[in-house]
Amino acid sequence: MNEDKNFDKRNALNAELASLMSGLSANTSPIGDWKVIKVYEARMLGKEDPYDMEQLSAQRQAARDRIIEIQNELKKLG
């Protein structure tokens, strides 16, 4: 029974991990790399940032922090 719980927990964690990782890179994600690139392009052209970079950076860091937490949990589960 305990193995079933660990299996279910691993599956849930892996699903969350995949979602978070995809969110950082997907071109449809509200925290995706594409937004960082758009801010960079605007700055290179001397234009105003199209997005709030502080908020975007904080959201992206929160996702990365959660990714690390999940990876550590998965290591503990074996």
Where do the model's predicted regions map?
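A preference for well-ordered globular domain cores
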Residues: 1-78
